[in-house]
């Protein structure tokens, strides 16, 4: 292990002790935002420090075994212990190198998930609903919370657009590579000739801002309109202008929210989504600049590019960024995304390691 890695790991060990002291303070929960930030930081560095301690213990085990090897009757045992400890040392060292790769500061954040129907008409809207169910089922497996913020149903039962908030540890880290174009090839239920149709949806995964103040929202640059929410009617028919539309004039970003029962709740949710979209736009611009200097397959978050094809007749899903094809479409559409997410993360880490070596 080189000196810079050792220095960084020692620094993290000291910081963990400091965080433990701060989080054990009786007054820490007075500022909940600060408490969340410190808790998130501790959750991020504690596993790294634990791994470093295991690495140091392996070094100590080698030293102890070498001393034992001086005694003839202990030499065979000591040699086996040295081999085992050296294997652990190599394994821990490689893992620590990965752990010290540049961290995405958004990895532990909650997310806003947006799915929009694209080409393909009704079939695209139905696929948007299928994608939402896939992500909702994945969230359920992770014990995350899913809250629909806004939805625009289609006439056939799908969604022209749906926005949801997914809350849970590491939500962004696991789903951040889902942004982009998703193409589906299948025979629609309305197709009488058995022909395969191709349609597409666009997915955007955006990290939630800790506070709306994280994004500079000048009230003078916002146009806020209220209108009557559309719905099924009945006893809960909306007789007031509770739906809210917010337009960010400098960027032209528009957010509508009408799923909440009150104008106050709809406005608060719309502001949260707006802050996330503006922040996401800034991130995309930054990533585009980075992509211009080096090729990145999975880390750009390009919304316009087709990232994945779902071919139902063949039972396969292909991720075009890493040339991965899995013949388990039913399991994946039911929320079994772990293999896909892990493969994309591994490719991203390989790119980071290659960039560090340049």
From Swiss-Prot:
Name of the encoding gene: prfA
GO molecular function, one term: translation release factor activity, codon specific
Subcellular location(s) of the protein: Cytoplasm
Organism: Nitrosospira multiformis (strain ATCC 25196 / NCIMB 11849 / C 71)
HAMAP family given in the database record: Rel_fac_1
Top-level taxon of the source organism: Bacteria
PTM comment: Methylated by PrmC. Methylation increases the termination efficiency of RF1.
Family per record: Belongs to the prokaryotic/mitochondrial release factor family.
Task of the protein: Peptide chain release factor 1 directs the termination of translation in response to the peptide chain termination codons UAG and UAA.
Keywords: Cytoplasm, Methylation, Protein biosynthesis
InterPro entries with a match to the protein in the record: PCRF (IPR005139), Pep_chain_release_fac_I (IPR000352), Pep_chain_release_fac_I_sf (IPR045853), Prokaryotic/Mito_RF (IPR050057), RF-1 (IPR004373)
Gene3D superfamilies, per database record: 3.30.160.20, 3.30.70.1660, 6.10.140.1950
Modified residues (N5-methylglutamine): 235
Any one cellular-component term (Gene Ontology): cytoplasm
Protein name: Peptide chain release factor 1
């Amino acid at each position: 292990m080189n000196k810079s890695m050792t220095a960084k790991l020692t620094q993290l060990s000291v910081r963990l002790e400091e965080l433990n002291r701060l989080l054990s303070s009786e007054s820490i929960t007075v500022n909940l935002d600060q408490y969340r930030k410190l808790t998130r930081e501790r959750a991020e560095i504690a596993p790294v420090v634990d791994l470093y301690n295991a690495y140091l213990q392996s070094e100590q085990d080698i030293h102890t075994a070498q001393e034992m090897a001086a005694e003839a009757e202990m030499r065979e045992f000591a040699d086996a212990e040295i081999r085992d400890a050296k294997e652990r040392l190599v394994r821990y060292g490689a893992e620590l190198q990965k752990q010290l790769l540049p961290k995405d500061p958004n990895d532990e954040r909650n997310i806003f998930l947006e799915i929009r129907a694209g080409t393909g008409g009704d079939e695209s809207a139905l696929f948007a609903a299928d994608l939402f169910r896939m992500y909702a089922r994945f969230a359920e497996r992770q014990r995350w919370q899913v809250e629909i913020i806004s939805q625009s149903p289609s006439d056939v039962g799908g969604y022209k657009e749906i926005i949801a908030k997914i809350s849970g540890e590491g939500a962004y880290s696991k789903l951040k590579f889902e942004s982009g174009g998703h193409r589906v090839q299948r025979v629609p239920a309305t197709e009488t000739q058995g022909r395969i149709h191709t349609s597409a949806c666009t997915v955007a995964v955006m990290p939630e801002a800790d506070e709306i103040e994280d994004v500079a929202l000048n009230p003078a640059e916002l146009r806020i309109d209220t209108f009557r929410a559309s719905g099924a009617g009945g006893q809960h028919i909306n007789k007031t202008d509770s739906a809210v539309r917010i337009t960010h004039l400098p960027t032209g970003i528009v957010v509508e929210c009408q799923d909440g029962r009150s104008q106050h709740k709809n406005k608060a949710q719309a502001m949260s989504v707006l802050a996330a979209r503006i922040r996401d736009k800034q991130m995309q611009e930054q990533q585009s600049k980075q992509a211009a200097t080096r090729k990145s397959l999975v880390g750009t978050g390009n919304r316009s590019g087709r990232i994945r094809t779902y071919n139902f007749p063949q039972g396969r899903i292909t991720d075009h960024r890493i040339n991965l094809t899995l013949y388990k479409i039913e399991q994946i559409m039911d929320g079994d995304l772990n293999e896909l997410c892990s493969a994309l993360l591994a490719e991203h880490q390989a790119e980071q390691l290659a960039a560090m070596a340049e």
